[in-house]
């Protein structure tokens, strides 16, 4: 087996939207880094019945609506 071809696998902290944290091992970042999630199963519409609103990260939804808001799909 070749040496030094695999990424470093180390412990990181994952922080959920509600502030809950847990330790896991990953190739993300470097040892001891914290991965902060924008969306997780506790707030994702697929697991909450679709009642939650997706967070608009950086105005992407507004930019999409501005760009494509006037389009119609064959209806007059």
UniProtKB/Swiss-Prot annotation:
Keyword terms, alphabetized? Ribonucleoprotein, Ribosomal protein, RNA-binding, rRNA-binding
PROSITE patterns found in the cross-reference section = RIBOSOMAL_L31
Gene3D superfamilies in UniProt: Ribosomal protein L31 (4.10.830.30)
Extract the GO molecular function terms from the UniProt entry.
Answer: rRNA binding; structural constituent of ribosome
Q: Which SUPFAM superfamilies match?
A: L28p-like (SSF143800)
Q: Gene Ontology terms, cellular component aspect?
A: ribonucleoprotein complex; ribosome
What are the disulphide bonds in this sequence? Answer: none
Top-level taxonomic group: Bacteria
Q: Which GO terms are recorded in the biological process aspect for this UniProt protein?
A: translation
Q: Among its keywords, does the record have rRNA-binding?
A: yes
Family statement drawn from the similarity comment of this UniProt entry: Belongs to the bacterial ribosomal protein bL31 family. Type A subfamily.
Q: What does this chain do?
A: Binds the 23S rRNA.
Q: How is the subunit organization of this protein annotated in UniProt?
A: Part of the 50S ribosomal subunit.
- Which named protein is this? Large ribosomal subunit protein bL31
């Amino acid at each position: 087996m070749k040496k030094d071809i695999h990424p470093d696998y180390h412990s990181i902290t994952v922080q959920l939207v509600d502030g809950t944290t847990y330790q896991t091992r990953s190739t993300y970042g470097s040892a001891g880094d914290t991965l902060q999630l924008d969306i997780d199963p506790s707030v994702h519409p697929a697991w909450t019945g679709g009642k939650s609103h997706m967070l608009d990260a950086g105005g992407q939804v507004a930019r999409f609506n501005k760009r494509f808001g006037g389009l119609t799909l064959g209806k007059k």
